[in-house]
């Protein structure tokens, strides 16, 4: 079966594993998924991410993060720009998620960035997802 939106698939796998409080999950790897996972790690939404070589496309193993009382760190994920309806934001229109409590992930000419990084670099791009 052909996967039409691999980023949405990754976000759905994270959302599903998070809902049942799994410790880790695996997704087929790609460069953009790897960069999104690194942003989630850097922003404190996941504990760790590792790349596993399997002589094909590779696998990303994502370790989810929970609070001291087993509460979820990721409360929501939403795919914004989809293959059927792309959503772009200019440099001065980069969205804020929950007044800065969450992050927006953008694909820009300078790589995959968070909304804060895009504002600092004064660049716009395709709004991939919101995470809060």
From Swiss-Prot:
GO molecular function: rRNA binding; structural constituent of ribosome
Keyword terms: Ribonucleoprotein, Ribosomal protein, RNA-binding, rRNA-binding
Transmembrane spans: none
Pfam families: Ribosomal_S8
Claim: Ribonucleoprotein is one of the keywords in the record: yes
InterPro entries referenced in this protein's UniProt entry, alphabetically: Ribosomal_uS8, Ribosomal_uS8_CS, Ribosomal_uS8_sf
Gene Ontology annotations of biological process type: translation
GO cellular component terms attached to this protein's record: ribonucleoprotein complex; ribosome
Alphabetical list of SUPFAM superfamilies matching this protein: Ribosomal protein S8
Keyword Transcription attributed: no
Assembly notes: Part of the 30S ribosomal subunit. Contacts proteins S5 and S12.
PANTHER family: 40S RIBOSOMAL PROTEIN S15A
Family to which the UniProt record says this protein belongs: Belongs to the universal ribosomal protein uS8 family.
Functional note: One of the primary rRNA binding proteins, it binds directly to 16S rRNA central domain where it helps coordinate assembly of the platform of the 30S subunit.
HAMAP family: Ribosomal_uS8_B
Name by which UniProt lists this protein: Small ribosomal subunit protein uS8
Gene, per the UniProt record: rpsH
């Amino acid at each position: 079966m052909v996967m039409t939106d691999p980023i949405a698939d990754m976000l759905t796998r994270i959302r599903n594993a998070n809902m049942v409080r799994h410790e880790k999950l695996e997704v087929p790897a790609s460069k953009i998924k790897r960069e999104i996972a690194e942003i989630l790690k850097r922003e404190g939404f996941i504990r760790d991410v590792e790349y596993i070589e399997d002589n094909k496309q590779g696998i990303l193993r994502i370790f989810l993060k929970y609070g001291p009382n087993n509460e979820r760190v990721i409360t929501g994920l939403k795919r914004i720009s989809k293959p059927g309806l792309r959503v772009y934001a200019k440099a001065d229109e980069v969205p804020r998620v929950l007044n800065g409590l969450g992050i927006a992930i953008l694909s820009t000419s300078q790589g995959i960035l968070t909304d804060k990084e895009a504002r600092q670099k004064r660049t716009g791009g395709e709004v991939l997802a919101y995470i809060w």
